[in-house]
Protein backbone atom coordinates (compact mmCIF):
# COMPACT_ATOMS: atom_id res chain seq x y z
CA UNK A 1 0.00 0.00 0.00
CA UNK A 2 1.35 3.38 -0.94
CA UNK A 3 1.56 5.91 1.85
CA UNK A 4 0.51 9.51 1.15
CA UNK A 5 3.34 11.89 0.45
CA UNK A 6 3.50 15.38 1.91
CA UNK A 7 5.39 18.30 0.45
CA UNK A 8 8.27 19.78 2.37
CA UNK A 9 6.21 22.94 2.83
CA UNK A 10 3.43 21.03 4.60
CA UNK A 11 5.93 19.14 6.76
CA UNK A 12 7.66 22.37 7.71
CA UNK A 13 4.33 23.96 8.61
CA UNK A 14 3.37 20.99 10.79
CA UNK A 15 6.75 21.10 12.49
CA UNK A 16 6.39 24.81 13.17
CA UNK A 17 2.92 24.30 14.67
CA UNK A 18 4.22 21.47 16.84
CA UNK A 19 7.15 23.59 17.97
CA UNK A 20 4.86 26.52 18.74
CA UNK A 21 2.63 24.35 20.90
CA UNK A 22 5.65 23.00 22.76
CA UNK A 23 7.04 26.49 23.36
CA UNK A 24 3.65 27.64 24.64
CA UNK A 25 3.40 24.75 27.08
CA UNK A 26 6.94 25.22 28.34
CA UNK A 27 6.54 28.99 28.65
CA UNK A 28 3.63 28.55 31.02
CA UNK A 29 6.01 26.87 33.47
CA UNK A 30 3.24 24.96 35.18
CA UNK A 31 4.80 22.27 37.35
CA UNK A 32 3.04 18.94 37.25
CA UNK A 33 1.00 17.97 40.27
CA UNK A 34 2.32 15.19 42.51
CA UNK A 35 1.68 11.78 41.02
CA UNK A 36 -1.82 10.53 41.68
CA UNK A 37 -2.96 13.70 43.47
CA UNK A 38 -4.78 15.44 40.63
CA UNK A 39 -4.70 19.17 40.03
CA UNK A 40 -2.72 21.15 42.58
CA UNK A 41 -4.77 23.55 44.71
CA UNK A 42 -3.46 27.00 45.65
CA UNK A 43 -4.84 28.75 48.72
CA UNK A 44 -4.22 32.35 49.78
CA UNK A 45 -5.09 33.17 53.39
CA UNK A 46 -5.73 36.89 53.00
CA UNK A 47 -5.84 38.90 56.20
CA UNK A 48 -4.25 41.75 58.17
CA UNK A 49 -1.88 41.92 61.11
CA UNK A 50 -3.13 40.70 64.51
CA UNK A 51 -6.25 39.05 63.13
CA UNK A 52 -5.56 35.41 63.98
CA UNK A 53 -3.98 34.69 60.62
CA UNK A 54 -0.94 32.91 62.09
CA UNK A 55 -3.32 30.49 63.79
CA UNK A 56 -5.31 29.91 60.60
CA UNK A 57 -2.03 29.47 58.76
CA UNK A 58 -1.09 26.70 61.17
CA UNK A 59 -4.42 24.97 60.58
CA UNK A 60 -3.24 24.55 57.01
CA UNK A 61 0.48 24.12 57.68
CA UNK A 62 0.00 21.10 59.93
CA UNK A 63 -2.07 19.26 57.32
CA UNK A 64 -0.01 16.46 55.72
CA UNK A 65 -1.07 17.45 52.18
CA UNK A 66 -0.04 21.11 52.47
CA UNK A 67 3.11 23.05 51.64
CA UNK A 68 2.79 26.28 53.63
CA UNK A 69 4.71 29.54 53.84
CA UNK A 70 3.91 32.41 56.18
CA UNK A 71 4.04 35.86 54.59
CA UNK A 72 6.61 35.29 51.84
CA UNK A 73 6.01 38.90 50.71
CA UNK A 74 7.65 40.04 53.94
CA UNK A 75 10.85 39.90 51.88
CA UNK A 76 9.45 42.38 49.34
CA UNK A 77 8.56 44.91 52.02
CA UNK A 78 11.86 44.33 53.81
CA UNK A 79 13.85 45.08 50.65
CA UNK A 80 11.66 47.92 49.34
CA UNK A 81 10.68 49.48 52.65
CA UNK A 82 10.60 53.03 51.26
CA UNK A 83 7.66 52.14 49.03
CA UNK A 84 3.97 52.34 49.81
CA UNK A 85 1.58 49.39 50.00
CA UNK A 86 -0.17 50.20 46.68
CA UNK A 87 3.16 50.74 44.91
CA UNK A 88 4.39 47.33 46.09
CA UNK A 89 1.22 45.43 45.20
CA UNK A 90 2.49 44.15 41.85
CA UNK A 91 5.84 43.01 43.23
CA UNK A 92 4.04 41.19 46.03
CA UNK A 93 1.59 39.60 43.59
CA UNK A 94 4.36 38.43 41.27
CA UNK A 95 6.25 36.83 44.14
CA UNK A 96 3.10 35.10 45.36
CA UNK A 97 2.41 33.68 41.90
CA UNK A 98 5.93 32.31 41.60
CA UNK A 99 5.78 30.66 45.01
CA UNK A 100 2.40 29.12 44.19
CA UNK A 101 4.12 27.56 41.17
CA UNK A 102 7.00 26.38 43.38
CA UNK A 103 9.46 28.66 41.57
CA UNK A 104 11.68 29.72 44.46
CA UNK A 105 14.12 31.53 42.16
CA UNK A 106 11.84 34.54 42.67
CA UNK A 107 13.64 35.09 45.99
CA UNK A 108 16.89 35.88 44.14
CA UNK A 109 15.96 39.57 44.27
CA UNK A 110 15.36 39.54 48.00
CA UNK A 111 17.71 37.01 49.63
CA UNK A 112 21.49 36.53 49.71
CA UNK A 113 23.01 34.43 46.94
CA UNK A 114 24.18 31.75 49.37
CA UNK A 115 21.14 30.98 51.42
CA UNK A 116 19.63 28.34 53.63
CA UNK A 117 16.06 27.46 54.52
CA UNK A 118 16.39 29.70 57.57
CA UNK A 119 16.71 32.78 55.34
CA UNK A 120 12.96 32.52 54.66
CA UNK A 121 10.77 34.63 56.93
CA UNK A 122 9.23 32.50 59.72
CA UNK A 123 10.40 29.35 57.96
CA UNK A 124 10.17 27.11 61.04
CA UNK A 125 6.38 27.49 61.36
CA UNK A 126 6.07 25.50 58.13
CA UNK A 127 5.71 21.79 58.84
CA UNK A 128 6.73 21.11 55.23
CA UNK A 129 10.14 22.75 55.81
CA UNK A 130 10.71 20.69 58.96
CA UNK A 131 10.03 17.32 57.32
CA UNK A 132 11.33 15.39 54.29
CA UNK A 133 12.60 16.15 51.74
CA UNK A 134 13.86 19.32 53.46
CA UNK A 135 14.67 17.97 56.91
CA UNK A 136 14.22 14.88 59.06
CA UNK A 137 13.07 16.65 62.23
CA UNK A 138 9.51 15.35 61.81
CA UNK A 139 7.92 12.60 59.79
CA UNK A 140 5.90 14.04 56.96
CA UNK A 141 2.53 13.24 58.55
CA UNK A 142 3.36 14.40 62.08
CA UNK A 143 2.52 17.66 63.84
CA UNK A 144 5.65 19.85 63.86
CA UNK A 145 7.09 22.17 66.48
CA UNK A 146 8.90 25.41 65.68
CA UNK A 147 11.16 25.07 68.73
CA UNK A 148 12.30 21.57 67.73
CA UNK A 149 12.64 22.38 64.04
CA UNK A 150 14.83 25.47 64.31
CA UNK A 151 18.07 23.94 65.62
CA UNK A 152 17.77 20.82 63.47
CA UNK A 153 16.82 22.28 60.10
CA UNK A 154 18.17 25.85 59.92
CA UNK A 155 21.16 25.05 57.70
CA UNK A 156 19.36 22.90 55.16
CA UNK A 157 19.89 24.09 51.54
CA UNK A 158 17.36 26.62 50.29
CA UNK A 159 16.82 24.69 47.05
CA UNK A 160 15.06 21.92 48.95
CA UNK A 161 12.09 24.24 49.46
CA UNK A 162 11.29 24.03 45.76
CA UNK A 163 11.57 20.25 45.79
CA UNK A 164 9.29 20.03 48.81
CA UNK A 165 6.73 22.43 47.35
CA UNK A 166 6.45 20.37 44.17
CA UNK A 167 5.65 17.22 46.15
CA UNK A 168 2.43 18.48 47.78
CA UNK A 169 -1.12 18.62 46.43
CA UNK A 170 -1.83 21.97 48.13
CA UNK A 171 0.26 25.14 48.34
CA UNK A 172 -1.01 27.54 51.00
CA UNK A 173 0.36 31.04 51.57
CA UNK A 174 -0.68 33.41 54.33
CA UNK A 175 -0.34 37.10 53.44
CA UNK A 176 -1.22 40.45 55.02
CA UNK A 177 0.12 42.75 52.30
CA UNK A 178 -2.83 43.04 49.91
CA UNK A 179 -5.26 45.91 50.42
CA UNK A 180 -7.75 45.27 47.62
CA UNK A 181 -8.99 42.24 45.74
CA UNK A 182 -8.57 43.63 42.23
CA UNK A 183 -4.80 43.25 42.37
CA UNK A 184 -5.39 39.49 42.68
CA UNK A 185 -7.67 39.22 39.64
CA UNK A 186 -4.78 38.20 37.33
CA UNK A 187 -4.02 35.28 39.67
CA UNK A 188 -7.67 34.24 39.85
CA UNK A 189 -7.93 34.19 36.06
CA UNK A 190 -4.49 32.61 35.53
CA UNK A 191 -4.87 29.13 33.94
CA UNK A 192 -1.69 28.02 35.70
CA UNK A 193 -3.32 28.48 39.11
CA UNK A 194 -6.23 26.82 40.87
CA UNK A 195 -6.65 29.56 43.45
CA UNK A 196 -8.91 29.73 46.50
CA UNK A 197 -9.00 32.80 48.75
CA UNK A 198 -9.72 32.57 52.47
CA UNK A 199 -10.41 36.12 53.66
CA UNK A 200 -9.91 36.20 57.43
CA UNK A 201 -11.28 39.17 59.36
CA UNK A 202 -11.44 40.05 63.04
CA UNK A 203 -13.31 42.59 65.16
CA UNK A 204 -11.32 45.86 64.68
CA UNK A 205 -11.55 46.55 68.42
CA UNK A 206 -9.79 43.27 69.15
CA UNK A 207 -7.25 44.05 66.43
CA UNK A 208 -6.42 47.38 68.09
CA UNK A 209 -5.90 45.73 71.46
CA UNK A 210 -3.52 43.18 69.92
CA UNK A 211 -1.67 45.82 67.88
CA UNK A 212 -0.98 47.85 71.00
CA UNK A 213 0.78 44.84 72.51
CA UNK A 214 3.09 44.48 69.50
CA UNK A 215 3.60 48.10 68.44
CA UNK A 216 7.40 47.95 68.02
CA UNK A 217 7.28 44.86 65.82
CA UNK A 218 4.77 46.52 63.48
CA UNK A 219 6.53 49.90 63.14
CA UNK A 220 8.14 49.33 59.73
CA UNK A 221 5.00 47.85 58.21
CA UNK A 222 2.95 50.73 59.63
CA UNK A 223 5.17 53.14 57.74
CA UNK A 224 4.61 51.30 54.46
CA UNK A 225 0.85 51.18 55.02
CA UNK A 226 0.83 54.94 55.65
CA UNK A 227 3.28 55.71 52.80
CA UNK A 228 5.91 57.49 54.93
CA UNK A 229 8.84 56.88 52.52
CA UNK A 230 10.70 54.59 54.89
CA UNK A 231 9.93 56.26 58.21
CA UNK A 232 8.88 53.73 60.82
CA UNK A 233 5.67 54.46 62.74
CA UNK A 234 5.40 52.93 66.19
CA UNK A 235 2.95 55.32 67.86
CA UNK A 236 -0.31 55.81 65.99
CA UNK A 237 -2.61 57.74 68.35
CA UNK A 238 -4.99 58.71 65.54
CA UNK A 239 -5.39 55.04 64.58
CA UNK A 240 -4.57 55.71 60.94
CA UNK A 241 -3.36 52.15 60.31
CA UNK A 242 -6.45 50.59 61.89
CA UNK A 243 -8.56 52.89 59.72
CA UNK A 244 -6.77 51.75 56.56
CA UNK A 245 -7.04 48.09 57.56
CA UNK A 246 -10.80 48.48 58.07
CA UNK A 247 -11.21 50.21 54.72
CA UNK A 248 -9.24 47.45 52.98
CA UNK A 249 -11.42 44.71 54.47
CA UNK A 250 -14.53 46.53 53.24
CA UNK A 251 -13.03 46.91 49.75
CA UNK A 252 -12.11 43.23 49.57
CA UNK A 253 -15.39 41.89 50.96
CA UNK A 254 -17.52 44.15 48.77
CA UNK A 255 -15.60 43.18 45.64
CA UNK A 256 -16.03 39.49 46.45
CA UNK A 257 -19.62 39.41 47.67
CA UNK A 258 -21.37 42.29 45.92
CA UNK A 259 -21.58 41.58 42.17
CA UNK A 260 -18.30 39.62 41.98
CA UNK A 261 -16.66 38.83 38.62
CA UNK A 262 -17.54 35.36 37.24
CA UNK A 263 -14.05 33.95 37.83
CA UNK A 264 -14.45 34.51 41.58
CA UNK A 265 -17.45 32.21 41.91
CA UNK A 266 -16.86 29.49 44.55
CA UNK A 267 -13.28 30.70 45.06
CA UNK A 268 -13.70 33.15 47.94
CA UNK A 269 -14.61 32.42 51.54
CA UNK A 270 -15.03 35.05 54.26
CA UNK A 271 -14.14 33.80 57.75
CA UNK A 272 -14.48 35.71 61.00
CA UNK A 273 -11.93 34.87 63.67
CA UNK A 274 -14.67 34.98 66.30
CA UNK A 275 -16.66 32.23 64.57
CA UNK A 276 -13.52 30.13 64.52
CA UNK A 277 -12.94 30.78 68.24
CA UNK A 278 -16.49 29.76 69.14
CA UNK A 279 -16.74 26.60 67.09
CA UNK A 280 -13.28 25.66 65.82
CA UNK A 281 -13.96 22.23 64.37
CA UNK A 282 -17.07 23.27 62.44
CA UNK A 283 -15.34 26.25 60.82
CA UNK A 284 -12.20 24.25 60.10
CA UNK A 285 -14.20 21.48 58.45
CA UNK A 286 -15.82 24.13 56.25
CA UNK A 287 -12.42 25.60 55.36
CA UNK A 288 -10.96 22.20 54.56
CA UNK A 289 -13.97 21.30 52.41
CA UNK A 290 -13.65 24.63 50.58
CA UNK A 291 -10.00 23.90 49.79
CA UNK A 292 -10.30 20.17 49.11
CA UNK A 293 -8.71 18.86 52.31
CA UNK A 294 -9.87 16.25 54.82
CA UNK A 295 -9.73 16.47 58.62
CA UNK A 296 -7.61 13.66 60.06
CA UNK A 297 -8.05 12.34 63.65
CA UNK A 298 -4.55 13.58 64.53
CA UNK A 299 -5.38 17.08 63.30
CA UNK A 300 -8.70 17.05 65.14
CA UNK A 301 -6.94 16.28 68.43
CA UNK A 302 -4.29 18.95 67.82
CA UNK A 303 -6.93 21.57 66.96
CA UNK A 304 -8.86 20.80 70.14
CA UNK A 305 -5.72 21.12 72.24
CA UNK A 306 -4.54 24.34 70.59
CA UNK A 307 -7.93 26.05 71.06
CA UNK A 308 -8.66 24.86 74.61
CA UNK A 309 -5.65 26.12 76.53
CA UNK A 310 -5.82 28.47 79.50
CA UNK A 311 -6.14 32.23 79.05
CA UNK A 312 -5.28 34.45 76.09
CA UNK A 313 -1.54 33.69 76.06
CA UNK A 314 1.48 35.65 77.26
CA UNK A 315 2.63 38.81 75.51
CA UNK A 316 5.92 37.15 74.56
CA UNK A 317 3.84 34.62 72.59
CA UNK A 318 2.09 37.29 70.52
CA UNK A 319 3.57 36.04 67.24
CA UNK A 320 3.43 32.33 68.10
CA UNK A 321 0.66 29.78 67.76
CA UNK A 322 0.44 28.29 71.24
CA UNK A 323 -2.28 26.55 73.22
CA UNK A 324 -4.76 29.20 74.37
CA UNK A 325 -8.42 29.61 75.22
CA UNK A 326 -9.58 30.83 71.80
CA UNK A 327 -12.82 32.31 73.14
CA UNK A 328 -10.91 34.19 75.85
CA UNK A 329 -8.57 35.60 73.20
CA UNK A 330 -11.47 36.84 71.08
CA UNK A 331 -13.09 38.65 74.03
CA UNK A 332 -9.98 40.06 75.74
CA UNK A 333 -10.44 43.58 74.32
CA UNK A 334 -13.71 43.96 76.24
CA UNK A 335 -11.80 43.77 79.53
CA UNK A 336 -8.76 45.87 78.69
CA UNK A 337 -9.45 48.66 76.16
CA UNK A 338 -10.62 52.06 77.45
CA UNK A 339 -14.10 52.86 76.16
CA UNK A 340 -12.84 56.10 74.58
CA UNK A 341 -10.61 54.07 72.23
CA UNK A 342 -13.43 51.69 71.44
CA UNK A 343 -15.68 54.58 70.52
CA UNK A 344 -12.98 55.98 68.22
CA UNK A 345 -12.48 52.63 66.48
CA UNK A 346 -16.22 52.37 65.98
CA UNK A 347 -16.24 55.82 64.38
CA UNK A 348 -13.39 54.96 62.01
CA UNK A 349 -14.49 51.40 61.26
CA UNK A 350 -18.26 51.75 61.26
CA UNK A 351 -18.54 50.45 57.69
CA UNK A 352 -16.42 47.38 58.45
CA UNK A 353 -18.31 46.60 61.66
CA UNK A 354 -21.62 46.79 59.82
CA UNK A 355 -20.51 44.84 56.77
CA UNK A 356 -18.72 42.07 58.64
CA UNK A 357 -21.37 41.60 61.30
CA UNK A 358 -20.02 43.17 64.50
CA UNK A 359 -22.32 45.04 66.88
CA UNK A 360 -21.18 48.40 68.30
CA UNK A 361 -21.26 49.13 72.03
CA UNK A 362 -22.57 52.47 73.29
CA UNK A 363 -21.25 52.52 76.84
CA UNK A 364 -18.59 51.00 79.04
CA UNK A 365 -21.36 49.00 80.68
CA UNK A 366 -22.22 47.34 77.36
CA UNK A 367 -18.53 46.80 76.67
CA UNK A 368 -17.99 44.85 79.91
CA UNK A 369 -21.26 42.91 79.72
CA UNK A 370 -20.14 39.61 78.17
CA UNK A 371 -23.73 38.38 78.08
CA UNK A 372 -24.30 40.93 75.30
CA UNK A 373 -23.34 39.12 72.11
CA UNK A 374 -21.54 41.47 69.71
CA UNK A 375 -21.29 38.93 66.89
CA UNK A 376 -24.18 38.99 64.43
CA UNK A 377 -25.26 35.82 62.59
CA UNK A 378 -23.18 34.80 59.60
CA UNK A 379 -24.33 34.99 56.01
CA UNK A 380 -24.71 37.69 53.38
CA UNK A 381 -28.36 38.27 54.32
CA UNK A 382 -27.26 39.35 57.80
CA UNK A 383 -25.03 42.14 56.51
CA UNK A 384 -26.09 45.50 55.20
CA UNK A 385 -23.67 46.48 52.46
CA UNK A 386 -21.56 49.49 53.42
CA UNK A 387 -19.69 51.47 50.81
CA UNK A 388 -15.92 51.81 51.07
CA UNK A 389 -16.26 55.10 49.21
CA UNK A 390 -18.25 56.69 52.01
CA UNK A 391 -16.55 59.65 53.62
CA UNK A 392 -14.60 58.48 56.64
CA UNK A 393 -14.28 60.55 59.83
CA UNK A 394 -11.25 62.80 59.80
CA UNK A 395 -8.26 61.18 61.46
Swiss-Prot record:
Its EC number is 2.8.2.-. One of its GO terms (biological process) is carbohydrate metabolic process. Residues 27-395 are lumenal. Keywords: Carbohydrate metabolism, Glycoprotein, Golgi apparatus, Membrane, Signal-anchor, Transferase, Transmembrane, Transmembrane helix. SUPFAM superfamilies: P-loop containing nucleoside triphosphate hydrolases (SSF52540). InterPro entries: Carbohydrate_sulfotransferase, Gal/GlcNAc/GalNAc_ST, P-loop_NTPase. The chain crosses the membrane at residues 8-26. One of its GO terms (cellular component) is Golgi membrane. Belongs to the sulfotransferase 1 family. Gal/GlcNAc/GalNAc subfamily. In human, there are 2 related proteins, CHST5 and CHST6, the latter mediating sulfation of keratan in cornea. In mouse however, there is no CHST6 protein, CHST5 functioning as a corneal keratan sulfotransferase and mediates such function. This is Carbohydrate sulfotransferase 5. It comes from Mus musculus (Mouse).
Amino acid sequence: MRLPRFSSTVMLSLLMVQTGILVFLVSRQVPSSPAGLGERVHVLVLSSWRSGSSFVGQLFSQHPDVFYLMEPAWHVWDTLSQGSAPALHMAVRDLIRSVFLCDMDVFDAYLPWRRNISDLFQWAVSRALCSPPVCEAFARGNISSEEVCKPLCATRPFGLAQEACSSYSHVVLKEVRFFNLQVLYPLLSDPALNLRIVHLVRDPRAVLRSREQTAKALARDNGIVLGTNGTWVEADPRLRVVNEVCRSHVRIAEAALHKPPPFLQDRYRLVRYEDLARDPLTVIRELYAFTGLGLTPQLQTWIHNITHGSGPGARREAFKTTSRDALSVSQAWRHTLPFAKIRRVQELCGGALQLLGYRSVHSELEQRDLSLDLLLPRGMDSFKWASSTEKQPES
